[in-house]
């Protein structure tokens, strides 16, 4: 049993990660402001990561899982506030790759601004750069779109609600835009492998091996509920006004991940798990007005 610090621990990825390792028998601590209900099987360290002071100096962790680092300052403040620790794993983002890079994106490509992600991507990159200098043995993970139980972002839940209501689904263009996903449990499994095997590589793209078109992803969401899908092609409207992803076709080379973890959860299976969680936790999703835009403008 290890002693693990998870930053966050109250919503989606950080909550799932904390729960995953706690259920494995690890001694899990979560660092957050205590503004939301806590998991029952973790120890809370109440604090704002922007103002930690000496809250962490009395602790010694086998691993730090930094799920909520969005800026250089986030990483710098946490690293400086920690006492003794072993491994450090930061969940970064594929948004660090410029959209002009050849695809699939590989870990050895240059990183920089991406017009679709803006400051989110450049801030993640600055956080990565500081971490690599301050903690050379740290691991950095660059996922595409994460999904699965505890999802609070209105992505697959949006499609689920359209399917439940028997709505036609409004697809951007011909539906051929490709996206890549990674189940949050697979993220946890890969973190577990890093902690066990300590491979020499320090930066990993993570994700499903294959990208999927919008049309196929929506169909899988409808299939998860058992609802027939009828689509309407949309042109001439801003995509983010009526759809839950940017107008941005990209995917990652995840061969380094696959070498360590060959099996990942099939998207169809993962979406069924997502729907089962959503059915029981509808109030945990932050909704956006996609349906209202469609009904009023399309």
Predicted regions and their residues:
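Glycine-rich Rossmann NAD(P)(H)-binding loop
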Residues: 7, 148, 172-177, 204-212, ...
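Active-site "gating" loop of Rossmann-like NAD(P)-dependent oxidoreductase/epimerase domains
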Residues: 93-118, 133
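C-terminal amphipathic/interface module of NAD(P)-dependent oxidoreductases
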Residues: 247-298
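Mid/C-terminal beta-alpha module of Rossmann-like enzyme folds, strongest
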Residues: 193-245, 249, 282-284, 288, ...
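Conserved beta-loop-beta element that borders a ligand/cofactor-binding pocket
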Residues: 128-150
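Alpha-helical substrate-binding/gating segment
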Residues: 160-170, 177-212, 219
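NAD(P)H-binding glycine-rich loop region in Rossmannoid oxidoreductase-like domains
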Residues: 34-90, 96-98
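N-terminal Rossmann NAD(P)H-binding glycine-rich loop of SDR-like oxidoreductase domains
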Residues: 4-24
């Amino acid at each position: 049993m290890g002693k693990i610090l998870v930053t966050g621990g109250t919503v989606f990825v950080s909550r799932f990660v904390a729960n995953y390792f706690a259920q494995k028998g690890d001694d899990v601590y979560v660092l957050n402001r205590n503004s939301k209900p806590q998991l029952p099987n973790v120890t809370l360290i109440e604090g704002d990561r922007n103002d930690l002071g000496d809250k962490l100096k009395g602790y010694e962790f086998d691993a730090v899982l930094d799920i909520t680092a969005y800026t250089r300052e986030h990483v710098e403040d946490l690293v400086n506030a920690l006492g003794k620790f072993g491994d450090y794993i930061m969940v970064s983002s594929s948004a660090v790759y410029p959209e002009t890079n050849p695809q699939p994106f590989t870990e050895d490509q240059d990183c920089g601004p991406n017009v679709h992600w803006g400051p989110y991507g450049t801030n993640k990159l600055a956080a990565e750069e500081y971490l690599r200098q301050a903690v050379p043995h740290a691991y950095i993970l660059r996922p595409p779109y994460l999904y699965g139980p505890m999802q609070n972002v209105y992505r697959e839940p949006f499609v689920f609600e359209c399917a439940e209501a028997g709505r036609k689904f409004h697809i951007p263009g011909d539906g051929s835009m490709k996206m890549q996903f990674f189940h949050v449990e697979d993220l946890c499994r890969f973190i577990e492998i890093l902690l066990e095997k300590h491979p020499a590589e320090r930066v990993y793209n993570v994700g499903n091996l294959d990208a999927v078109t919008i049309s196929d992803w929506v169909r899988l969401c409808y299939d998860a509920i058992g609802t027939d899908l009828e689509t309407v092609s949309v042109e001439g409207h801003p995509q983010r006004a009526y759809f839950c992803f940017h107008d941005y076709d990209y995917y990652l080379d995840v061969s380094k991940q696959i070498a360590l973890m060959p099996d990942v959860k099939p998207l169809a299976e993962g979406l069924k798990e997502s729907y089962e969680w959503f059915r029981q936790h509808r109030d945990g999703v932050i909704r956006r007005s996609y349906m209202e835009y469609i009904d009023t403008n399309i």
